[in-house]
Regions:
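Conserved C-terminal structural/oligomerization subdomain of aldehyde/semialdehyde dehydrogenase
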Residues: 33-36, 227, 318, 368-370, ...
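Short acidic active-site motifs
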Residues: 45, 216-217, 412
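Terminal low-complexity tails and localization/encapsulation signals of metabolic enzymes
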Residues: 1-38, 72-76, 108, 123-154, ...
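Rossmann-like NAD(P) dinucleotide-binding subdomain of oxidoreductase/dehydrogenase enzymes
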Residues: 126-273
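Residue-level signal for inorganic ion chemistry
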Residues: 32, 70, 92, 114, ...
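Glycine-rich loop-to-alpha-helix module at the N-terminal edge of alpha/beta enzyme cores
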Residues: 35-125
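Short, well-ordered beta-strand elements within core beta-sheets of diverse protein domains
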Residues: 35-41, 58-62, 152-153, 263-266, ...
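ALDH superfamily catalytic-core signature
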Residues: 229, 237-386, 408-411, 416
Length: 446
């Protein structure tokens, strides 16, 4: 299957171009080369997709099909994902910049997602009768599971196929219809996936695909009274806007937003293990993960040894083409995102942080193969405190901030960890299981 040169909008059962002919390039982050051009949906395209989705949900038998029929399609999709794993992983890597190994893990994950929901949805196949003292024998009271209707799925650029399938599989298993809006930065695996869905037998009306920026069609999708649910993964500000928009029509809304995640390390940890854990937790996928351990909060007596070890390991991380098996991590996703990371590093220095390693692009003389791509060296910022913006705000890149707490002062460690508007995830490392358990139960991760 080739995507180059084919329309990338799927509306009302047909692949089509944008109504105004608009297109945008998508780039390979490794060398900034253009992979292909995708159609840029307009507001009118979005309205047409909503109307088509609503009409299909109302007039087709999709939502009334048996769970067995729909779950069979999910299992077929899982089979197809494994059959096409190599090509899907390659597409995900050239579009996002992540390593091929990471992309292959993502494909295995989404395969399991489809199989999981194919099994779980069958448990909803039979209505459950409610009995009890408040239900007379003459009354039949049932718990009935019904689809929501038209679901808009808006996905991020860092894990495009993974995040989509987490939303897509349960929505389709339960008889909903979906309108998919991938990030305009990394839409390719989503386009490929929709082709696969049609090939395995999903009804063409059960899915609409809009490739476009959120700015151009987002409000149309979230404000429409004909949309019943919006599921969004992405940034905090956009999430707030979507929640407000959905509130106007009182539609269902689920969001997963930013993270600024603490990684507390106590001095009793094995040093080598802690170095490996801290390094991996922050620099995987060049830090472009909402759950990365971007804030190291370390006990004072261990701090210098741990930070020195992380710096040494970070400087040995092999950066390169995600398709190269030797690469441990790839580039940032775009030139714009790299500029954001550079601005955070500059600001951190102005606020008093000390760069222990990284903080710049790779030297083009020493690393000529990285010169064209959106690379940025793994960066460790020492001497940070909780008032700094680089500590409080989500940089979403290869930046580790280091905060220290006095020996034995667990309360300060927890206070530092909880001093964030983000939360989302967190870690506690200690050989003392009781102390670790006591600490993580006090973490407030909204």
């Amino acid at each position: 299957m080739t995507l180059v040169g084919t329309p990338t909008l799927f509306i009302d059962g047909e692949w089509c171009a944008s109504s105004d002919g608009g297109r945008r390039p998508t780039y390979n982050p490794y060398d900034a080369s253009v992979i292909m051009h995708v159609d840029e949906a307009t507001a009118n395209d979005a309205r047409r997709a909503i109307a088509a989705a609503k009409a299909f949900f109302s007039s087709s038998d999709w939502s009334r099909r048996s769970y067995q029929d729909r779950c069979e399609l999910l299992n077929r999709m899982a089979d197809s994902l494994q059959k096409n794993k190599a090509e899907l992983a390659r597409i995900e890597t050239i579009d996002t910049g992540k390593t091929l190994g990471e992309s292959e893990i993502d494909i295995d994950d989404v395969t399991n997602v489809f199989r999981f929901y194919a099994k779980e949805a069958l448990k909803l196949a039979e209505d459950k009768r409610v009995t009890g003292p408040l239900v007379p024998e003459s009354v039949k009271s049932l718990v009935v599971h019904e689809p929501v209707g038209v679901c808009v799925l808006i996905t991020p650029w860092n894990y495009p196929i993974l995040q989509l399938c987490w939303k897509l599989a349960p929505a389709l298993a339960t008889g909903n219809v979906v309108i998919v809006k991938p990030s305009e930065v990394t839409p390719l695996s989503t386009i490929y996936l929709v082709h696969m869905m049609l090939e395995v037998g999903f009804p063409s009306g059960s899915i609409q695909l809009l490739t476009a920026s959120g700015a151009s069609i987002g409000s149309v999708l979230t404000e429409s009274p004909d949309v019943d649910l919006v599921s969004f993964t992405g940034g905090l500000q956009t999430g707030r806007s979507i929640i407000r928009s959905c509130a106007e029509t009182v539609k269902r809304c689920t969001v997963e937003l930013g993270g600024k995640n603490p990684n507390i390390v106590f001095a009793d940890c094995d040093l080598d293990w802690a170095i490996d854990n801290v390094t991996t937790a922050v620099f995987v996928h060049s830090g472009q993960v909402c759950s990365v351990g971007a804030r190291l909060i370390v006990e004072e007596s261990m701090a210098d040894k741990l930070v020195n070890g992380v710096v040494e390991r970070a400087q040995r991380i092999v950066m390169g083409n995600g398709l190269d098996a030797a690469s441990e991590t790839g580039p940032l996703v775009s030139a714009e995102h790299r500029a954001k990371i550079e601005a955070y590093v500059k600001l951190a220095q102005e606020e008093g942080a000390v760069i222990r390693c990284g903080g710049v692009r790779p030297d083009p003389v020493e690393f000529p193969h990285l010169a064209q791509g959106y690379f940025f060296l793994p960066t460790v910022l020492d001497k940070c405190d909780r008032t700094m913006r680089v500590v409080q705000e989500e940089s979403f890149g290869p930046i580790l901030t280091v905060e220290r707490f006095p020996d034995g002062d667990e309360e300060t460690a927890i206070m530092l960890a909880n001093d964030t508007k983000y939360g989302l995830a967190g870690g506690v490392q200690s050989k003392d299981q009781a102390r670790a358990a006591g600490s993580y139960t006090h973490l407030t991760l909204p």
